Amino acid sequence: MDKFEALKIWEHEYGDQEYAHDVIGRKIKRSDYLMNNQVGWVVTYMRPLNQGGTNDEGNTIILHHHTALEKGDNFPEFYVDSIKYIVKYEEDGDFYYIESSEERDDNL
């Protein structure tokens, strides 16, 4: 995805804020799209395309680049810092969202 398209998604999610936090709380900076630094971010899919996800607004999410690496193609569950997250689907609104299960797995 080019930066122009990514920034349209940023504006939809965060407005004109220069800084925000991804779903797990990692700080991201609007101008640092695709940058591999402390506040860099990417646009990715909650349900990966190779697992039946769709390339539309209801399936995209902005994540810190470290969060995106940890999530990878894991679906519907993934772990970040030993905390379990679950991707859920809201059929009425046709969108995915992520919830924390508050369950830690210290064996990871």
Residue ranges and their predicted role:
Residues 14, 45, 99-100:
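Short, isolated positions within intrinsically disordered regulatory regions of eukaryotic proteins
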Residues 28-63, 68-75:
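Histidine-centered nuclease catalytic patch
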Residues 52-58, 69-108:
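Polybasic, low-complexity binding patches
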